[in-house]
Amino acid sequence: KEMKKLNKNIYVKLLRVSGVYFEGNANNEMITRIVGKSFENQEDLDKYNEFLIDAKERDHRKIGQELDLFCFSDYVGPGLPLYTPRGTIVKDELQKEIERVCRKYGFQKVSCPSLADISLFETSGHAMKFNDELFRVNSPKGHEFVLKPVQCPHHTQIYASKLRSYKDLPIRYMESDKQYRAELQGAVGGLSRVYAITVEDGHSFCTREQVKQEVINMCNLIKDFYSNMGLWNDHWVSLSVRDYEHPEKYIGSKEDWDICEQMLKEVSDELGLNAKRCEGEAALYGPKLDFMFKDALGRDIQIPTVQLDFAMPK
């Protein structure tokens, strides 16, 4: 019933029909969204149907419930997972291993509050670029705060809290803490897209001359950890660069971007990462190396990232 033969070469699989607000704005009219996939032959369609059955059995939400690892509550809200005692053990053990590897590569653990004054994110540029993704909190006296969507602005303030000498560099901080993003409700699901997620974040403050070695250090850290997890040989790397036709989307000078992109290319070549150049995939403040790993169904999932940022320190 879900497959209709349009002609001798095209087959369609209807996946779902749902209502959605136009442009994601609840004040707009609700329209119907139809999601499907087309195939050139019956064999490809049959393979896809088998994939869907396999995906349903391997769905982490189903496995998480069966193994009693996490749950959700309508009272708590969607996109806000609750880890059970068993799930918390798994989560804590992973966190301990990540912190152990980070210390091995010279990172010092820090701890920052979940809230920050809105001015911090106005200065960093996040308030302008990600305005719709910020959870804003007003104090009884009307003072505006933000639940942190990233950790980097906080870490810059630890670095800036006292005078530093170039002899102290590089200085490496790491933190394991919650980050908050106001995702579109229709996009929230399971543990893959949530409002609050624990992120292991590391930042290295260094001179320009030290940047390349710091990137290499972080890439080796990633290889170390994911090798321990048995995942390293099933991945590929994206050299995520800017969209050259829309420079207004990014912070920083063209010269700095050119330097950063070339440096990441050199690191990829030297470490044998064979990074694939992906235009338009950079963050607003710099290019990056995105490490893509395969899940149990062969889908690419971005997990760790090495990000260069010349803009925020300024």
Label each residue range with its predicted role.
Residues 137, 143-144, 153-162, 171, ...:
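A translation/RNA-centric and nucleic-acid-associated enzymatic feature enriched
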Residues 1-183, 188, 192, 204, ...:
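Auxiliary tRNA-acceptor-end handling modules of aminoacyl-tRNA synthetases
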Residues 94, 214-218, 260:
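Hydrophobic alpha-helical membrane-association signature
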Residues 9, 29-31, 132, 142-144, ...:
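Active-site lining segments that contact anionic ligands and/or coordinate catalytic metals
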Residues 1, 230-301:
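Metal-assisted phosphate- and nucleotidyl-transfer catalytic regions
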Residues 57, 207, 220-227, 265, ...:
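Generic secondary-structure signature for well-ordered alpha-helical cores
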Residues 64-88, 193-254, 279:
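Conserved alpha/beta enzyme-core scaffolds, especially Rossmann-like or related mixed alpha/beta domains
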